[in-house]
Amino acid sequence: MKKILVAVVVALFSINAMAQHEIGAIVGGMNGASYKYWFNDALALQADLAVGLTEAAGKTSVSQYDFTLNPNVEYHWALPVENLKIFAGGGLNFGLCNNLKYGNSNTVAGKFGINAITGLQYDLASVPLALAFDFRPGYGMSFDKNSNTSHFFDWKIAFAVRYKL
């Protein structure tokens, strides 16, 4: 039993030794805070808490802006350029949005959706910074207190700067 306990403790410490945290800011279609947790060299969880314009805003009567939590799971592949990776994955987005109704009435609505994510990340060699550029197409729905539901396709382009902890 002691051997199993020692093996589990060693495994937990080795997981933390591989883990890398990044924290910073994201700007573009979303503006806010960005956090990335690396499970290993290729698999990461990225979570962004941001305010932004919904890209469908000028084309539909769905939403003008949103406040979103957007967690994504990403898989990274190394490219021939040193410290440059391409990534792809998917995630959820949920939060609040300013729901524009027919006429001129404005209501705050809940929002939920799914999205894909793809982009490039460059890790600076001389300082512990990561620069990332990503594209996020997605599908979502907003719902207000009167059970009115709106469906929309949305996309965001964003640039992130994160400090490696």
What residue ranges belong to the model's regions?
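Sec-dependent N-terminal signal peptides
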Residues: 4-13
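Sec/Tat signal peptide C-region and signal peptidase I cleavage site
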Residues: 13-19
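Solvent-exposed loop/turn segments connecting transmembrane beta-strands
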Residues: 21-34, 51-65, 81, 143-152
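Gram-negative (and chloroplast) outer-membrane scaffold detector with strong preference
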Residues: 37-133
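Flexible, surface-exposed loop regions and adjacent strand-edge segments
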Residues: 104-107, 148-154
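C-terminal binding/interaction regions
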Residues: 134-136, 160
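Short helix/strand-capping connector loops at secondary-structure junctions
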Residues: 136-144
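Outer-membrane beta-barrel "beta-signal"
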Residues: 153-165
